[in-house]
Amino acid sequence: MARILGVGRSSASSLNNKEDNESDVALLSPKDPNRVHTKEQLAHPASSNLDPSMQGLPAGLSLDDFIPGHLRTHIGSSSRGTRVPVIRNGGSNTLNFQFHDPAPRTVCNGCPPPRRDGSLNPDPAWYQTWPGPGSRPSMSPKPPASQHAQNWSATWTKDSKRQDKRWVKYEGIGPVDESGMPIAPRSSVDSPRDWYRRMFQQIHRKMPDLQLDWTLEDPPKVVSARASSAEPRHLGTLQRPASRPGTTETSSGRNWNHSEETSRNTFNYNFRPSSSGLHPPNQVPRHREKVENVWTEDSWNQFLHELETGHKPKKPLVDDPVEKPAQPIEVLLERELAKLSAELDKDLRAIETRLPSPKNSQAPRRPLEQPGLEQQPSARLSSAWRPNSPHAPYFSSSRPLSPHRMADGGGSPFLGRRDFVYPSSAREPSASERGSSPSRKEEKKRKAARLKFDFQAQSPKELSLQKGDIVYIHKEVDKNWLEGEHHGRLGIFPANYVEVLPADEIPKPIKPPTYQVLEYGDAVAQYTFKGDLEVELSFRKGERICLIRKVNEHWYEGRITGTGRQGIFPASYVQINREPRLRLCDDGPQLPASPNPTTTAHLSSHSHPSSIPVDPTDWGGRTSPRRSAFPFPITLQEPRSQTQSLNTPGPTLSHPRATSRPINLGPSSPNTEIHWTPYRAMYQYRPQNEDELELREGDRVDVMQQCDDGWFVGVSRRTQKFGTFPGNYVAPV
């Protein structure tokens, strides 16, 4: 007996199996030589000579499936409605089916079919069509081709060794629900492929849209070229034939050769899409057009091939439509880089419009090598130095404070302007730079400024200036320092020491009036005063003060009798004994004609006091910050009415810094020399520059000059060296 592959287990009851076995035994003819052998096989299945694969068959099998057709009795045609095909083994790839009689009878065509009776004639569609061992094919005539065309279909196993015929319950894909999904099992329909196709489309109809290779030239066209090329074949298969090729063969046991089986194999099955799932090319639904276009005939055949064989496909079912760029990546990168470069250039231009021109901030230091600066309009320079400009220096109405004042706890008690931190960007001008001056035309194009205070240079890079001088600004070193030129000399100076002149004003230097001290005044300190500024004079209670001039009604300028300390102080701290007498002169400062005899000895060493830049408008009505919080009684003595007493600034008597020898004061006093004044060091001082003098406590120092910044110039008797040192480190002997 031939080997049957893939026969599944049955779910029928044992009672039905027993009835089927009894009916199968009754179907055997008495004259059949195989009847006795068949009975023995049924009675002793373990000792039968069946194929080993047939031993231990499921109990749901009946002998109708194994008895040749010419030995079977007729079975009523009504049993055809009770045969329901069921897929076993989880839907194996061989697509083999097991037929059983369900327990509750199903309704077929509106009426319940009768129970199968073994005494009735069997339907020829239910017995096997392949010959058994030793048997010959039946020579019975073939029925008409259309007799069972709608009642059965063929299914082949994978090894192509045999064929089986089964009953078909539904035509096409069978009934569907309201959404279009098939209801009947796939094994009970006439077109399982169409059934599977419809089932797949209904399950995946909401799947994400697949990316297709759309043509950019024709936007309304949504069907790809590959899908449109397959449409003629789809349209040509809309008219399905009434029966499939080869289904009209009779069941008279013809021999199946391998060539015929291969031509009718499911692997070579011609894909025929269902007419219910197709639409005209111009009426493709929006939600299904991409799925229809992607799953072509070849894709479906390959997908079903993989489903039946379980093998991996050689190529993807649907080509992954990788979106290719319209242009090469190099072109896109170059375009993006050009766009970024354009944006960067735009931002840089916007920044350049908001910032000053680099020619202003990076002008050459040499005046003769500035062609770009000469060609700049004065309007731009004036706008750069407006008070509301972000680069405009801060102009104070009073003399600027010292940048640093040492704390009481350590370091030098007072170093004055020696503590200035000069900008590192300004290099020392050479002699050629200081000696070279631009032309008058160049000076007019530069911005001019007038000095508000005297400025004494402390390093070669600085420029010594006096109040009222005109200086031409070359550039701004930083927010605190400017670089400019005065009388051919180039250097830096503080920005808050100058006042920038308007463009329409002619730069003309203003010299302060010169006063001659006719008679020095006299005062006695009633309270101890400690100055907070360089120009302020500190004294103790009871010290006598020589008055030089009256700055205004609240401030006096004077010096401590017997010392070289000089400065301004509030009038409320002293008792005025005698007001100083001054005289305005145009020829320069002169010594008093008849000085006080009590102060002659002291005036000899201080005949020309250092200049202190004091503006009466700056000091009027102002007190020291530290003194403002110190309560003291106001005992201001009314000054005596004198015509020589002035409320205007006093004389500004200045002279250049002293050298190592006594300095001749010039033609105004040709016979006057500065005498040395002995001082004693009160504190130890370590020099910080080469021109400074080392002091130890108790050293004797001969002071030659007292500078306006609080520093003294003299010679140490211990080291016999000449230099400068802070004046508050020493005291007069």
Curated annotation (Swiss-Prot):
Phosphoserine modifications at: 412, 459, 594, 607, 610, 624
Source taxon at top rank: Eukaryota
SUPFAM superfamilies in alphabetical order: SH3-domain
Gene Ontology molecular functions: vinculin binding
Chain intervals with Low complexity compositional bias: 597-613
Regions of compositional bias (Polar residues) in chain numbering: 147-157, 245-256, 264-277, 638-651
Record region (Disordered): 1-51, 129-165, 224-285, 352-448, 584-672
InterPro entries: Endophilin_SH3RF, SH3-like_dom_sf, SH3_domain, SoHo_dom, Vinexin_SH3_1, Vinexin_SH3_2, Vinexin_SH3_3
Sequence ranges of Basic and acidic residues compositional bias: 32-42
Region (Binds to vinculin): 444-579
Keywords assigned by UniProt, alphabetized: Cell adhesion, Cell junction, Cytoplasm, Cytoskeleton, Phosphoprotein, Repeat, SH3 domain
Location(s), subcellular: Cell junction, Focal adhesion; Cell junction; Cytoplasm, Cytoskeleton
SoHo domain boundaries: 164-232
Spans annotated as Binds to SOS: 674-733
GO BP terms: cell-substrate adhesion; MAPK cascade; negative regulation of transcription by RNA polymerase II; positive regulation of MAPK cascade; positive regulation of stress fiber assembly
Modified how: Phosphorylated at Ser-594 by MAPK1/ERK2 during cell spreading.
Family matches, as Pfam families: SH3_1, SH3_9, Sorb
A GO-annotated cellular component: focal adhesion
Domain SH3: residue ranges: 444-503, 518-579, 674-733
PANTHER family associated with the record: SH3 DOMAIN-CONTAINING, VINEXIN
Function: Promotes up-regulation of actin stress fiber formation.
Subunit details: Interacts with vinculin by the first two SH3 domains and the proline rich region of vinculin. Binds to SOS (guanine nucleotide exchange factor of RAS and RAC), through its third SH3 domain. The formation of this complex is down-regulated by phosphorylation of SOS. Interacts with SAFB2, INPPL1/SHIP2 and SRCIN1. Interacts with DLG5 through its third SH3 domain. Interacts with SOCS7 and MAPK1/ERK2. Interacts with FASLG.
Protein name: Vinexin
Gene: Sorbs3
